[in-house]
Amino acid sequence: MSDLEAFRSEIRAWLEANCPPEMRQPANDEGDVCWGGRNFQFKNEAQRQWLEVCAAKGYTVPDWPMEYGGAGMSAAQAKIWREENARIGARPPLSSFGIWMLGPALLKFGTEEQKRHYLGEIARGEIRWCQGYSEPGSGSDLVSLQTYGDDKGDHWLVNGQKIWTSYADKADWIFCLVRTDKANKYQGISFLLFDMASPGVSTKPILLISGNSPFCETFFDNVAVPKSQLVGELNRGWDVAKYLLGHEREMISGAGGGDRTAAIGPAMARNGIHDPLLRAELAAFDVDALAYSAMGEKFLDEVKVGKGHPAQSNMMKYVGTELNKRRHELFMAAGGSRALEWESESTGGGATPRTWLRTKANSIEGGTSEVMLNVIAKRILELPGA
């Protein structure tokens, strides 16, 4: 037996012994997702137990170094961990912008003190983070942002507004792009971390067409941010932001992969499955989702050894977005007119149509599909500009 085969056997046995049965079922609503944080309310004891046993082993961030709360797995071992979790249908023990976005940025740009302070909290699910990038007048043209940090010696005094801040009303801390030099558009932005409980921080939820409010407006009114909470170099926050955006797009693109039966299974139980055209669409989706998952694994392997194309995350984001939208279009097609019911048992109390509506935003968040296609054309296909 090879070392990797032995490792797979070890992980398989550990999962069988430690993953509660309740955590081996698909997440049906927001309460089934463990976000962690100071004020997070566990849905049940199984959810709490699953986070605690995984955090104790470093399995919430398996490929992070052990000294920062991870398990120190190699790329091959982390792939086995993901495969074995998928095999039993295990839910992620922790979902976190800290894991998906801030953590990788801190590992690359953070000071040793920042890594030791923040990464362990992220890995254990003790702090919930949100991202402060977009502003009312700065979306696709992010470098035009106006939130300003006035240098006061040992701290910055931050004033401004962010928008589309996911779960800002529930987050403990925010990683934020702040202008610290008004004279230079690109080299005048810094990447700051600050506590959402700081005086002067306020949030206002934004109601979406789906009926939910996962996004917020976030306001900063004379918020004091210590100089020790600067990540990377002063006025070079755009370097950190570009690196982090790649991880954000990987996160959003992940919605297109996952369990391929997530679209096919529900459709099989509905009358629409008898439609031969729908059956053909389901088969095509299954093939494309499998190809996408394989592409994602290849990309992760390349990133781990420093060979990933800088623009590949744009491609993953675009394809993942389109797949996720297709997935939910198939839900609706299979359900027929009844799938539009907002309050019925067959649609999970309206979860099916609400989620279908929510997926329309996938084409905008994290960079619009049009912007992604432009980047792919220029940086991967090397097509000439207009």
Residue positions per predicted region:
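Amphipathic, small/basic residue-rich leader segments at the start of a protein or domain
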Residues: 1-96, 117-124, 266, 276-283, ...
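C-terminal helix-coil-helix/basic helical segment that borders enzyme active sites and/or dimer interfaces
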Residues: 25-28, 273-279, 290-346
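Glycine-rich phosphate/cofactor-binding loops in nucleotide/flavin-utilizing enzymes
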Residues: 76, 80-81, 101, 240-254, ...
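N-terminal glycine-rich flavin-associated loop
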Residues: 94-113, 139
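A short, Trp-centered hydrophobic/proline-enriched beta-strand micro-motif
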Residues: 125-133
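A short core secondary-structure module
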Residues: 146, 154-155, 159-202
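Glycine-rich phosphate/pyrophosphate-binding beta-alpha loops
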Residues: 163-168, 209-210, 361-366
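Glycine-rich beta->alpha junctions and the first turn(s) of the following alpha-helix
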Residues: 200-294, 362
